[in-house]
Every structure is written in C-alpha cells, then in structure tokens.
Amino acid sequence: MRYNQLSYIPTSLETAVAELQALGFAVQQEQAPKESFAIFLRKLFFHFQDTDYPLSHMIATKELDLLSFLASDEALTKEVFDLVALQVLGFIPAVDFTDTQDFIQKIGFPIVFDSQQLLLNLHQLLATRQKSGVTLIDSLVSQGLLPMDNCYHYFNGKALATFDTTSLIREVVYVEAPLDTDQDGQLDLIKVNIIRPKASTAIPSMMTASPYHQGINETANDKKLHRMEGELSPKAPRRITVEPTDFQPLATKPSRLPVNECQETFSHISSYTLNDYFLARGFANLYVSGVGTAGSTGFMTSGDYAQIESFKAVIDWLNGRATAYTSHKRDYQIKADWSNGLVATTGKSYLGTMSTGLATTGVDGLAVIIAEAAISSWYDYYRENGLVCSPGGYPGEDLDVLTELTYSRNLLPGDYLRHNDHYQQLLSQQSQALERQSGNYNQFWHDRNYLPQADHIKCEVVYTHGLQDWNVKPRQVYNIFNALPDGLGKHLFLHHGEHVYMHNWQSIDFREAMNALLCQKMLGQNNGFTLPTIIWQDNQKEQTWKELTAFGGHSKRQIALGEDHVLIDNHYGEEDFKRYSKDFRAFKAELFEGKANQAVIDILLEEDLPINGQACLKLKLKSSENKGILSAQLLDYGKKKRFADIPAILELDSIDNGQQFAREALKELPFKDSPYRVVTKGVLNLQHRSNLLTIEDIPNDQWMTITFHLQPTIYHMAKGDTLRVVLYTTDFEHTIRDNSNYALTLDLEQSYLLIPTDEEE
C-alpha cells in the first residue's frame, strides 16, 4: 500500500480539539502529549471495558508493549508514534514490515509527527485510511462509536455514517416529463426509485441516471447485432453539414391535483456502492432509467436531448418545478418535501454519459456530477474518423442495438402487446438515421453530441477515466474536459485501468474526497476543501498518483519513422480471415506478436518521453484502390512491470459503507511484468484524411499526405524503452472486416510521429 491522501483538510488546533472532543476523545490542549496519546488510544477500544487488554497486544518499541510503554517514563517519540499509528491502521509488525521508518517512507505515510502538535497528528490519523481501505474514523463509526440518530455529524469537513440504514424509506414516484417520445398524445412518465433515510431536515440527493436499471433485453440485443464482415464502400466526395441541435421540450403546467403520500414501494433495487456510502451519510439515493424503460412510458431515444430531458425532469421535480404522480393513473401528485433540491449524479459509462448530458442543460439544482468513463459524443463511441468503429469488446454493436438492450418496456408483456408494433417503427427509423453503411457524421449524431453545449455547464464536474478504456475511449473525456468553461470547478482522475470504477481502490481516497466535495457543495459545509484539477496515476510506479494541470501538453516532439517504403496488405487468406472474424482476440494477439498484415517500426528512446495528449502520425502513403482503412497502435514494447487494466481484489468485504452496511471489496490495479502495453491507438477512413466533415476521393496509386490523431493519453516512457509503432488496415475488434485485395504503401522517410509532451517549452 502507498498513501495518496487527497481528502484530509488541514485545520486549526482549536478545530481539531473540538472535533476530537465531539467524538468522545477527552483530550485537552493543556495535557502532556503522552497523556493525550493514551486517552486517544483507549478511546479507540470503546468496545472493551478493560482497555489494558487490547493495548497489551500492541507494541511501542522492540522492547515494550504499548500498555507498558504508557505506564513507563519513556518519552513519546516519532519512532513510537509511527509504530503505534501503523498498528492502529491495521499494519502488523513482522508481517507487513520490519523496519518502521523504512516502511513509513515506502508507503508515503502522510502524518509528520510533532510532539508539540500531537492533537493535530491524532486528528489526521482519524482521517487516514486503514490498510482495509476505510478511514480510521469511518471504521470506528461503523463499529458504533456514534449512534445512528439520523442527524448529520461531520469530521474534518466530511459527513459521518450516522443515518439509520436499517430503517430506510423506499418509494416510487412517476415524474411527468415535457416529452411525448412515443407519440401517444400524453406526456411521458418517468419512474423514479427513491431510497432515503428518515431525517428531520431537508436532504440532498445522489441520482444515478441508468437506462439499464429497470432491466435489459439481451435477447433483442443479440438479434440486432450487426454483421462486421463486409466491404468498405467508397463514398462520393462532399462536405458534410449539420445544424445546431434544436431540442424543444413540450409545454407543461403546474398540477392542481390533490397531494398524496407515496402509493408504491419496493424492497430492493441494485445499487451503486458509492451511493450506498452517501446514503449512510444523509443523502437520498435516486435510481432513474428514463424514457422507454420498464415502469416509464415513451420511446428509448438513446442519447439525445429528449432522453436527457427525462432525467432533467426529475431534478426539476426535486426543486418544485415539475409534477410527479403517485401512480400511472395520474390522479394524485406527490411533492419532494424531503429534498433540499441539490443533486449529485453518479455512475459509469452510459450512466456517466447521462450526467454529462444533464450538466450541459445547465439545470438548476444539479450541484455536482461524478461521471465515470462517460461518453461526450455518441458518434465517437460508435464511429471514428468516417468509419463504423465498434466499442472495444463489442463488435457489431451500434446505437440501435443499445436501444434494443435498454428498451425494457418490452420486458413487460402488457407493454409489449400494446406498444411493440409502434416501437418497431420508431426503431427502424433510428436504424436508418444512424447511417451505418457510410460511417458518416450527420444530424442524428450531432444531436447526440454534448460538446457544443459544454459552455452551458455550471455545476462542479468530476470525471474519472481509464487510459486503457477502449470501450468509452479516452478522447471522450479529453474533449469534454478541455471544452469546459473557464472558471468552472473541474476535476479529472485518470487511471491506467480499462472500463472500471475506482472508488474502492486502496491507493487513493476517492470516496472520502467526494465526501468533502459534496458536503461543501450540497450541505453548506465551509470546509475549505480543494480538489486538484487533474489527478493522474503514474504508470511507472505502483500506487502513485500525481497532480497535473492539463490534459494535453503544449510541447511537441518529432520522431522519425525510418527511410524505407513499406507495403501493408489488407487481404488475408480465407482460413486466417475466418479465424480472426470468429475471435478478434486472436487477431490482437498476433498483431502484437508481429504476425498479422502490418508494418512495425521500433523506436529506441534516447531520452525520457512524457506523453500528454493526442499523438499524431504525419504520413505519406498511397492505396492501390480508391478506398482504404488505416489503423495504428503505439506500444510500450518489451518486458517490464506495468499495470494490468482490471483491478484485483485485495480483500473481500473490507469496506463498510456505513454501520455494517453495503460492504464491498478493496481493490487495486496489479503492477506486474508484461511483454507490452498499448499506449494509444486509432482508426481512419482515408477518405476523411483532412477532417471528419470532408469526404475526399482516394486516387489509385497516388501519394497522399495525411494527419492522423490517435486517442489521447498521459503515459511516461523512460530512456532506453522501446516505442513500437504498428500500422495496419482492418482492425477485427473495431472496424468493418473488409477482406478485399488492396494494399497501402507508406513512405517512411517522408513520415513522422508527433508526440505531445508535458515538458515546458
């Protein structure tokens, strides 16, 4: 374990003492340091009437157990404090470490002992994570240090788990959205599952906008998958134009219906453990699936502003601007009189995507979005540079396939009976509008691009994204983060995992940092917390995070690619083509081994290379036909320690998100030997060699110069490392599988690689 403590808020001695005393630690500024230390330690063992017993099982020095030390005349030194603090945090001498000071250095222990400031040290110790992944104070509260009295209690600017999760209110309401997406003449109703603690004051909400949450139709999804094998068709040259998105919600009016209490409850809904964490700390949890999902009405419009409006309506209801009904009969309305109107949105992938879309509406009441692996442009999810480009791991998926997956109204037989025929008509229109045959950007995709609306965002923004996420690729967060308005509170966590959550990792106190931020923004805590702009996981060191100021360096380093002409054949023999089409992982493995149709350029680095941004290939090439796909990958090549891209479980159920509530596993990305690592990649239709909106002819056997931007990343390579450039045509994971007989020729002498770096110019 290594500490990267973001969440601790430096405080005054007076505040520290007051907070310690409020928790029952009977310390005083006038006490001798050793006396305060003893009082603090004995309080940790509040389950014991005889606290001598647990103290006797700890050590203070190599010669003295802790109980004997406290009774002795020995002084409290840094060595003693550090050794005892480590044990309090769950580290075991002679098991986890032998030399205390070496271990303190190794793990980046965040507390610097000062006998004159011991109470500040003890205050920070309570706010420091244990080996198990929870802070010491959260561990104590989970054991019953404070009662579950349904009142807010804070420590170091963060809410504690004092809300009773054994007696929660679970209710369902139906919010009226200003939409009629299924064209039935009635405004769409949106089902909202609410879980909230019993509180005497108005409380904020965590909202997860999840089209998956009311069920998914995998059978319909699988039937709708598109065939990847086919021939890349040349496109007529033209300039693509689109109009600004012009979504207009329908008119609504305040309801005059009588107000009633909830008429529908539920016992269980799958939850997100970050929401559970906040539920125990006095935040309501709302799960909303939006239009076209089971329990709601409407059509699944998949990514456009109509879908986003269905989630926005819920925030409007929480603030008294929209109507909710107790049932589909629409005969009683229900008020969110428990809500303080402030909302934070959470969730990964599609869920985080809806957070971004919501933020671009500028809706009042949305205080913070915590958007993980979020899409900012749906074109860039299902297309790339004029090509159909399946998200990593899901060849054949497209937006209409996702519609089939998430249109969970068809999982209700009555809804299927009444609405499926009309749904199929709307789905057919959607399938035509996405222009799978051409791969072009068009109005359909522009209406699902949130980047042009980024200047409307006014809430605090937190993004997390994996730099090995080839499902929702890094360009999604790169573009939205760099499009955010100046002066906005914005924060980005970049890790080296794939499409994964990171709130339960050992090496970073993400959960606690979000607690401090949300208490500041949603509970009026003037805690002085400041979250860095960019927190990046250092790819060269285990469990190490660094603060950066920008995603995208201003300096460029030009790297030559060679002197030869190289030929890349597109066509494979029938056996190989079938094998690769059946299992794209076999293609990837052989590509990285140099066994596919490809050009490989190995570059031995003569100095460190700190990549930050979009690497760019400047290439001179020609195609033997009037079409062509160019795919590229950059690899950190050669055996050495690197991060795996899926977090491993370190300890099951070690994280308690409340008081014996919603336990989850502690995880971390393994750091282990590997033969190579993908640094970045990309695909390009050569007819879009100038830009996305310009389609150009490809003249047979005539040289072209292209600019090819790869996915952005932040990745540091060291002097002596090998940067491998892999160039090829068809990518069996992502692109159309075109096995036609054409080839690309590259003039490497007239080509180069341009690397953005975070070096100062």
UniProtKB/Swiss-Prot annotation:
Major enzyme class: hydrolase
Gene3D superfamilies per record: 1.10.246.70, alpha/beta hydrolase (3.40.50.1820), Galactose-binding domain-like (2.60.120.260)
Residues of the signal peptide: none
Catalytic reaction list: Hydrolyzes Xaa-Pro-|- bonds to release unblocked, N-terminal dipeptides from substrates including Ala-Pro-|-p-nitroanilide and (sequentially) Tyr-Pro-|-Phe-Pro-|-Gly-Pro-|-Ile
The keyword Hydrolase belongs to this UniProt entry's keyword annotation: yes
Superkingdom in the source lineage: Bacteria
Record: active site: 349, 469, 499
Main location per the UniProt record: cytoplasm
GO molecular function (one): dipeptidyl-peptidase activity
GO biological process: proteolysis
Annotated GO CC locations: cytoplasm
Keyword Nucleotide-binding among UniProt keywords: no
Pfam families: Peptidase_S15, PepX_C, PepX_N
Subcellular compartments: Cytoplasm
EC number: 3.4.14.11
Keywords of this entry: Aminopeptidase, Cytoplasm, Hydrolase, Protease, Serine protease
Family the entry assigns: Belongs to the peptidase S15 family.
Subunit record text: Homodimer.
PANTHER family from the UniProt entry: COCE_NOND FAMILY, PUTATIVE (AFU_ORTHOLOGUE AFUA_7G00600)-RELATED, PEPTIDASE S9 PROLYL OLIGOPEPTIDASE
Functional note: Removes N-terminal dipeptides sequentially from polypeptides having unsubstituted N-termini provided that the penultimate residue is proline.
Identification of the protein by name: Xaa-Pro dipeptidyl-peptidase
Organism encoding this protein: Streptococcus equi subsp. zooepidemicus (strain MGCS10565)
Organism ancestry: Bacteria, Bacillati, Bacillota, Bacilli, Lactobacillales
